Amino acid sequence: MLFAVLALFTTAGNADTGDSNRVIKATRATVLPVIDGRIGENEWPDATRASGFTDLVTGKPALEPTEAYISYDETFLYVAFKAYDKVPTGIIAREVLRDSRYSGGGDFGDNDSEDYLEVTLDPFLSAKQSDLCRFSVNALSTRSAKISGGRAGKAEWNGDWDAKATKTSAGWDAEMRIPWKTLSFPGGKKNLDFGLNFTRFQYRTRIKSQWSNTTPQQFLNLMGRWSQIEPPKEKHKPSLSLLPYALTTAKETGSQIRTGIDARYTVTPDFTIVSTINPDFATVESAVQTVAFSRAEQFVPERRPFFLEGANYFSAGSFYTFGPLFYSNRIGLFDIGAKAYGKLTPKDTLGFLTAIDFGDRVDTIVRYRHDISATDQIGLFASQSDVAKDNDHSGVVALDGSLRRNKVGLDYQLIKSSGLNGGGGAADLNFSYQDSFNFTSVQLMNAGRNIRSANGLFYFDDFKGFQVYHNWSREWRKGAWRSFSVDFFPSYTWHQDGTPYQRGGGLGVQFDTRSDWRLSTSVNHNMFDAQKDATIRFGITSGATNRFRQIGMELITGQQADKAYRFYAPNVSWRPIKNLDLLYTGGLQQFGGWRRQHILTGNFILSRTRTIGGRILVQEEPGSPATINPYISYREAGERGTETYLLLGAPNNKSFLPQVMVKLVFAR
């Protein structure tokens, strides 16, 4: 069977439609446009025009036309959009802070909560997410960028690019100016081709359209191409950017001053070194784990700038199988850290990271990826953690790869761990199929006893078997129902000695209405060893894609680990007055006693660079008194120059800590 599948991979072609893989020729700008959000007459005479956007869901021309323009010179790339709209009053723009995600879905949400325009560049033609540069703007001129590899939030590092937008009687216009030095691109070449796409999301109709149709599956190898670019002739000069900081903390017991520095050295246009000495994480608000029952350790998103910088170059491991091989939250405080990442060649990517806590712990991560083609890749991963006090030297090495032909995919990984209480291995093989309405995955898995990684997140060990996931979804352009999806996910595994481990599965259904209601339900029934999990979940949300007016409730009831179980999760996200955002999320679990969690977050926007915010975290465990941790903060950041932070309290404490912190970050 495996040989038959591999034969299919060698014979099947990649999906393509007439509106995919479009090509436009690069042109130099002789008339420099004024970036004011108004496309003036004869302001873009040299720019190449891109039109004929496609609705990704229907595959037909978008209902409202969009035009894009692109040109360049020795210093900048210039991009403009003209987005026509029959109902200009229906253009939605809400976010005002730079690098807002225009998203209704939190850390993993898609851009779906307001109108936006976006240009996507793939300078290495790799068709890999980690190599893409995305620049988007909403109708309030709020910029949002996702630079290749991942960047932290400081403007000096995230790129000093500009964008402006203006509503018109015919819709809205947008203009962008992107410095070459913001981009990673192949150096030493006289002519380049970039992967290119233009995207528009129209909130009123919920239509996402693209110039080069990548289909609902977002196949990146179907992006367009911007050809015959002549990059800047001036030879690249390595540049060094320094961000020293000073942090003063005043407590009842006294005060202290802490200093440190972050540095970013751009070796070439496609390779970067970042280092930090005495980093400060005390002022970074960490994400909070939910109190809901989970048989595996919960994944918590990373928010610390050092680990966000270049994060995509270290990504390895299947999130939905064994877990991520590098889980940066494993690394706590350290004294010095350094990372180097980027392209060795257009097809070879390297990431290296080390963090040293003198006298205690040293962590090292290495990730290498080779792009065989736009749809195929192979990679190596290595991780080592040396903890002196435990004499523990934990390591992991892994080989992984992926192939795709048309709508069929194959992913695999081989993992071997070593160290104290760890010496197991793991392997998985994942076959997938996806088209406009279906996604199916069949995974074969084998995890040995004692597989462990001090820097990774392994959900389970000592099992072998398979799991299946199937999703069927539809989206409609007319009628009361906007979208519908069904998920089915059976799983059958055994321990390595052959005794049953997990057997069962689940079924989920979700409806989204035209009026922005979301209704969902799911049923799960599993046996874990001799324990039964049997639950039913109900969810309802009003304003599902509008975080400024959203109310929801989730209820899970049934049985977990042979015990009666009930979980309530209310959430409210609201903007009661202009510039004031409030978010409440709760979790109440009845499972051999009550566990309660309440999180209230507030943020008042004084300007695009100044905010006042805070959070109150209340947690209660069975038989213990509740802990309450409030803190408030003032932040002046988001643009070039000195940043100022003032905090009362400690964001990541369990209970309130009476202290004041003042932090200044200087750009050099």
Predicted features along the sequence, with ranges:
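Surface-exposed extracellular loop regions of Gram-negative outer-membrane beta-barrel proteins
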Residues: 235-274, 363-418, 540-552, 568-588, ...
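Residue-level marker for the onset of beta-strands and adjacent loop->beta junctions
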Residues: 22, 64-66, 161, 259-261, ...
